[in-house]
Structure formats: C-alpha cells, structure tokens
C-alpha cells in the first residue's frame, strides 16, 4: 500500500521538476540563440507606431494598489469557496462552520478597511 502513495508522490515530483526545468531550458536556449544587436530604436518605448511624445514611466496613485490587493484577496476567497461549494453535501456541518469562520474573517477585514476609509477614492 505504501508503494501506491510513493508512486503518486513520484508523479507529482516529476511534474514539478518538469514544470521548473522546461521553462528554464526554454528561456536559456532563447537567450543563447537570439541575435544580440542592441540599438537606440530598440530601446525606445513602442506607442502604436507613433513617435513617443512623453516619458513611459507613469506614476500611479497608491490607491490603485490598495484596490488591486483587495481584489486579489476576495478573488482568492472565491477560489477557496468553489471547491467547498462543490463538495458541500459530503463535508457536513464542521466544514460549514469552518467556511463561515473564513468568510467572517474576510468580512471583518473588509469592514476594517471600510472603517479606515481605505475604500474611499478622495
């Protein structure tokens, strides 16, 4: 019985190694085989074929990052909720309570951000 588990983990390990090794090999080969002829035209920013008329380095307001982080947090929450919702019939009351605690913790964080006026734009 132990060999079945070891075989399963070996398959995961092989996929993990291939998932790391293949991109590294592809990027290394691409770097070695590409022509390296730097020029001033290649260093400029591309703006739909038009000559760039201002600097490409634009500063974003910090609030964009806060909204992006909040989006990522609640997006990951839905990733955790989906498998639970699919297998809800088999999990029982304990899993329901665990998921409610998880959702309440996220809602408390959202209420805290709302109270600190992080979600107000100006």
From Swiss-Prot:
Location in or out of the cell: Cell membrane
Membrane disposition: Multi-pass membrane protein
GO cellular component: NADH dehydrogenase complex; plasma membrane
The entry's keywords: Cell membrane, Membrane, NAD, Quinone, Translocase, Transmembrane, Transmembrane helix, Transport
Pfam family, one: Oxidored_q4
InterPro entries linked: NAD(P)H_OxRDtase_bac/plastid, NADH_UbQ/plastoQ_OxRdtase_su3, NDAH_ubi_oxred_su3_sf
Top-level lineage group: Bacteria
GO molecular function terms attached to this record: NADH dehydrogenase (ubiquinone) activity; NADH:ubiquinone reductase (non-electrogenic) activity; quinone binding
Leading EC class: translocase
Binding partners and assembly: NDH-1 is composed of 14 different subunits. Subunits NuoA, H, J, K, L, M, N constitute the membrane sector of the complex.
Family: Belongs to the complex I subunit 3 family.
Protein name in UniProt: NADH-quinone oxidoreductase subunit A
Organism the protein comes from: Bacillus anthracis
């Amino acid at each position: 019985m132990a060999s079945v588990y070891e075989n399963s983990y070996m398959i995961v390990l092989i996929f993990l190694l291939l998932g790391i090794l293949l991109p590294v090999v592809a990027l290394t080969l691409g770097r070695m085989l590409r022509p390296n002829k730097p020029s001033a035209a290649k260093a400029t920013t591309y703006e739909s074929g038009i000559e760039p008329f201002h600097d490409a380095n634009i500063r974003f307001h910090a609030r964009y990052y806060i909204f992006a982080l909040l989006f990522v947090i609640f997006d990951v929450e839905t990733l955790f909720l989906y498998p639970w919702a699919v297998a809800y019939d088999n999990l029982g009351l304990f899993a329901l309570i665990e998921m409610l605690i998880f959702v309440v913790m996220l809602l408390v964080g959202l209420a805290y951000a709302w109270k600190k006026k992080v979600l107000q734009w100006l």
